[in-house]
Amino acid sequence: MAIILGIDPGSRVIGYGVIRQVGRQLSYLGSGCIRTKVDDLPSRLKLIYAGVTEIITQFQPDYFAIEQVFMAKNADSALKLGQARGVAIVAAVNQELPVFEYAARQVKQTVVGIGSAEKSQVQHMVRTLLKLPANPQADAADALAIAITHCHVSQNAMQMSESRLNLARGRLR
């Protein structure tokens, strides 16, 4: 069993999603958004750090998964996003959580099957995969999708390791 915290970073709204993985079964534990309503960036970063730390304390995840920075057309926005990601990652590292990063395209490919999927498609698939009564809000759905991606990637890595181990055992006999 593992609890995974997914984070969809932003400088004003940070989505989070928490799921439990038992074997191949995924279950929803919680999701939402950290909203920073102050204008100055240092205060927003402080709120992000405090919010992520609070979520970690509440859910006690085993793994922390976050979306990688994409290259935005606006350099200022990309820098602010990078700082928000950094603060969230520091919150995880301070709690000694292993951090995993996934590209947005990989998350969409894993959850929807199309790397260029729309937000509404991600919301629908997250709802379906986690058996939720309604679509989660967009940023929370993205965070849940990041957590789901981590489960799939780690599951595949474990299967590959087992296959290699079985091959090695076969050669040793």
Curated annotation (Swiss-Prot):
One GO BP: DNA repair
Keyword Disulfide bond on entry: no
GO cellular component: a single term: Holliday junction resolvase complex
Subcellular location: Cytoplasm
Active site: 8, 67, 139
Cofactor binding comment, as recorded: Binds 2 Mg(2+) ion per subunit.
Catalytic activity field: Endonucleolytic cleavage at a junction such as a reciprocal single-stranded crossover between two homologous DNA duplexes (Holliday junction)
Cofactor(s) essential for the protein: Mg(2+)
Keyword set, alphabetical order: Cytoplasm, DNA damage, DNA recombination, DNA repair, DNA-binding, Endonuclease, Hydrolase, Magnesium, Metal-binding, Nuclease
SUPFAM superfamilies on file: Ribonuclease H-like
Enzyme Commission numbers on file: 3.1.21.10
Record-level Gene Ontology MF annotations: crossover junction DNA endonuclease activity; DNA binding; magnesium ion binding
Binding site for Mg(2+) 2: 67
PANTHER family tied to this protein: CROSSOVER JUNCTION ENDODEOXYRIBONUCLEASE RUVC (PTHR30194:SF3)
Family named by the database record: Belongs to the RuvC family.
Subunit structure: Homodimer which binds Holliday junction (HJ) DNA. The HJ becomes 2-fold symmetrical on binding to RuvC with unstacked arms; it has a different conformation from HJ DNA in complex with RuvA. In the full resolvosome a probable DNA-RuvA(4)-RuvB(12)-RuvC(2) complex forms which resolves the HJ.
The protein's name: Crossover junction endodeoxyribonuclease RuvC
Gene for this chain: ruvC
